[in-house]
Amino acid sequence: MTTTASAPIIDVVCATYNGVRHLSAFMESLRAQEDAAWRVWFRDDGSDDGTRELLDEFASTDARVQVIEDHQGRLGVTHSFGALLQHVASSAEYVMCADQDDVWMPHKMRISMARMREAEGRKPSPVLVHTDLRVVDGELRPVADSFWALTHLRPEPATVRRVVLQGLVTGATVLVNRALLERALPVPAEAVMHDWWLAAVAVSCGVVEAIHEPTVLYRQHGANVVGAARPAWEGAWHRLPQRVGTAITRRGAARRSIDETALQAGALDARVGPVMTAEDHRFVTAYSRIPTLGVLARKFSILRWRCRAEYGVLRNLGMMVRG
């Protein structure tokens, strides 16, 4: 690691759970960061594979490593990160989130911090910076140069409506400033994911900045695989029960997704509604009410507030029918 005297300290938060296999590689990549001063805070969520013991070993040999013990038990990933963010909020100026199984590229902190300072220089406000990722397999072999291209994700424009409806930000690439932490914390129970919540607050009362360059080797393995291919043909009759079951499952999943994002929108309205533009506030308030509506009113609201031209006719129709 190389540092400069002017480099601000970045507090890194990492929630762990049974991550012993890849944690050492993550730590090596953190120590290799260019022009960066950092501390890392871990919170383990009840691992039984030796993760906690490995974290204690890291902490015993490097004063920059801290393991928090808050006696809250298993919280799940969203609220484990929420607890970490809350823990560092009183002292941190800048915070990055990290996933236990990823590897950071050496320039990650340097270019993210440069963009942060540019954004803060234009207008002091809550800022979230995020980047593209390079997709790799479990052994770090290349899969795709761009996660955004692989998943057809367009990070811009980052409007309130887009961010409320779709998670545009990947937590492992995020850098946030103190002004955003002051607005976003504590992470509410209604948050779908901690990174989604941070992005929603940032776009509502500050700035979301996207860097079109990978800074993370995004490891795909097991349940983490992106866009796993399915067989194109398995025999229509054999697949009929599967298709019926899938249709029912997708309908339930679509409904849950709408309700979860609507509940998160309600929490967003309560947190920063007064500082939103009138148009954004009208959208967030209306969208947050969807779970309380009857069938016809719900369909109309989904058509009005959830469907978007960029999704295409079929996706919008499916969303309205299933939602």
Regions found by a protein language model. Name each.
Residues V164, E190-V192, W196-W197, L217-G323:
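C-terminal subregions of glycosyltransferases and related glycan-biosynthesis enzymes
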Residues T2-P231:
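Nucleotide-sugar donor-binding/catalytic module of glycosyltransferases
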